[in-house]
Structures are given as C-alpha cells and as structure tokens.
Amino acid sequence: MLVSPYGTPASFSTRNRNLIMETQSPFSRRKMLQNAGMGFGSLALQAMLSQNRLLGMQGTQGHHPAKAKSIIFLFMEGGPSHIDLFDPKPKLQELAGQPLPSSFKPIITPMGEYNAPLMPSKRSWKQYGQSGTWVSDWLPHTAQHVDDLAIIRSCWGNGLNHSNGVCQMNTGSTLGGRPSLGAWVSYGLGTENQSLPAFVVIEDDDGKVINGPRNWSAGFMPATYQGTALHSAGDPIRFLSAPKDIASERQNNKRKLIEALNRKHQADRSIDSELDARIRSYELAYKMQSEAPDAVDLSQESHSTLQLYGIDEKETAVFGRNCLLARRLVQRGVRFVQLYHGSGSRWDAHSGIEKNHSTLCKSSDRPIAGLLTDLKQQGLLDSTLVIWGGEFGRTPMSEKGDGRDHNSNGFTMWMAGGGVRGGQTIGSTDEIGLHAVEDRLHVHDLHATILHLIGLNHWDLVYSHQGRPERATQNEGRVCTKLIA
C-alpha cells in the first residue's frame, strides 16, 4: 500500500510534549531555546519550500506491471458534442424538431432546455479503418487512426456546469480541494527524469482554463505532486530561469550554501523525509534550468515533423506545437502531460454549434492525428496512453435554435496506445444520445482504468489525510477490462 509519510504530521501538542521532556535533561534551557529558534526557522523554510511545485519524487514501482509509462490527456474544455463527432444517431434525425418523447427520461440542464425541440446533426458520417468505426466529417484526420482508438460512448459524470464538470474529470470530485489525477500518478510513481517534473500542464496560449490551477492541484498532498504549468513559448516555466546578470557559477555557489544551511537545520530532524525531499528538489530545479528549455526547443525537429502537427498553418499552429511538446516531454520521461484545447470553455456551443465546432475541430484534428502518427513512428505509442475528451457532452435538444446544452448523462471519450485494445467501440448511449445505457463508465471508472494502465491499483493507491485513507476514486470505480489489450 502506498501511504504517504507526510499526511499525518505530529501535532503541535506532541511537539510541546517533546520540548517539556527535553527541559528535564541537562542543558535543557539551551536545547529548548535552540528548538524554539529552529522552529521559527523551520516555519520560514517551510514557507519557502512550499513554493516549490516543480518536481515529483524519485521514480518508484507501481502495484503491477504497467501497460503504459506515460499519459497524455487531451482535454477539450467546454464539452464537445459526442452526437456530432463519434456517436451518430439516426433516430435523432428522424425525430428532428419534435419535443423529447416521453419514453426518454428528462434530464436537468443548466439552461433548462429539456423541453426544447430535438436538433439533428448536420454532419456527414463515414466508417473508417478495418474496425468500421463511425466518425463525422469534422474529424477526418483523427478518423484515420480509429483502429488504434477505443472509443467509449457511455461515459457519464455528475457535473452540470463547467466548473464542477472540469473539476470532477480532473480530480474525481465536483468540489475543489482534492488531488488531480496527474498528482495521484506523480505521487504513486514519481518521475523517470530527475531534471523534469512528473506532471506537466500546457494551456492554450490565448485562454485560461476554468478553475485554473485547481484542476492540476495536489489538494491535501504535498505541493511537490501538483502539475507544473509549462508555456510553449518564451520561458517554459516562470521564475525558473536564472537572472541574466548572475553567472551560473555564482548561482551554483549560492545554491550550495543554501543547501548546506538546510542540511545543518535538518541534522536534528533526520526523520523529516519531507524536508529532505524539498532540499533535494532545489538541486533538481537547478538542473531544470537547462533541461526545460531544451524540451521546448522545437528547432531540433525536422520540417516534416512540424508539418505533421500542422505547425506550418495558422489554425493548427498553437495546438500542434503543444501536441509536439507533449511527445517531447514523454520522450524525456515525464509521467503525465495534460493539454488543454479550447481553454476558457470555448467548446461550449450553447448557440452556433456549426461555426463553433467547425473552428475547434479544425484547430485540433490535425495536431491530434499528428501526435498519434508521431508516437507510433517514434515507437512510443505502445508505452504512452493517449486520452481525448472533455468534462461532458451535449444534449440532443437544441438551445437557441442552433446550439446544444450541457449533457453529463452520456458522452464520448477515447483512449489509444499504452495497453489499450484499439479498433473498438465500448458502450452506447440511447437512440438520441441523451443517456449512457450500455457498459456505463462513470468518471471514477475512467480514472480507475487509467491508473490500472499505468501500473497503479486504485484501491491500493492510498494517501493518509487527517486519519483517513484517501483514494483517487473515492472508494468507487471499477477497471474497464474491455478496454485493455
């Protein structure tokens, strides 16, 4: 069982009792004052160290042999429409313009559109690959990879709005404060590259993800495990680069002095493994000053590779660059890379879904297909789990005439690579795409399956917090064995 040594620190009263016992021994007054002084120093040091959110711990073994070594989560923020992308519904075409039939259980929607007329999909659909998987004309490039994809049409969650939907897909809970899935992976496995974080997050350049850092937070775990926001242009990690007027040798000497002071402070605290880990993290942060810029330096890539990701075209350049960065990061041993597309809920098509999704699909389809192609060419797809999806899907009922409302009762995600049996469609929604009805997979089930593929048993991945065992799946979830190769 992976149980953190940091989750149950000694209480303040325990520390006081220790001091009282020490005052009964020779030199107790000096010792007491020393401890008290060091206590204030410890508070200052802790404040400094708590700001270090860059690095995971040293790599460890999981609970069972892993199918995947790394994860790339392609998060389409705002809620892409499953019934216009991966889940064709002939019955919806037949019932177009009619109210929801009484045979379908109504749902609660944020905008109250459950009585609005049903809206058919305007997309054309085609079967692709040996698997004959249906994909709409909005995703022609991704469609070429269906034999590598396991398309899950029966996902569901509890988030009605973007804030709680995004929060649940990232942390398992609609309420903030819990560790993100990437943080659990970082906690359970650490990093393979001691010069890079275990968990990296890349947002769109021109948008801010709803909830912000809460989505990649470590919650009640040490901040070491949270995601590091990496920027695809300029300094990859803010405040990491050394000041331009300070020579590298001078900076290294200063770092060594601080390390020596920290080690002296630690001498009487040999059991404080968290302090030791934070001290070591400064050494790793120093290494990152050279490693991180190299990881984002795309000048090392060939022109054909840049074209593969669509970096040569305006519409696909930003997300294409981010997808290529994801490949470069997992190639360097980063465990979990999360890319946000449509940051700021731009997939949220309450109106004008044709224009909205046409634009967003065009900017993401080619880069995603390029990522899958490149991972396979580099021999990385078998060891990299690629996940695509958003916080929920969209309703078959119309909103404002030409849009769709939120639908967390049934939506589509897909996975590829890393132990996934591709070329299959798992589960289904009802005839109009409103409810998941067959092989339903809750967010907790998705998380349990993702953890399983990377070598972690979601029941055994435990962190002790305030005296109770906490799990990523909150004591729920089951692994979807159909998905696993």
Regions found by a protein language model. Name each.
Residues 2-4, 12-485:
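Ligand-binding pockets and gating/stacking loops
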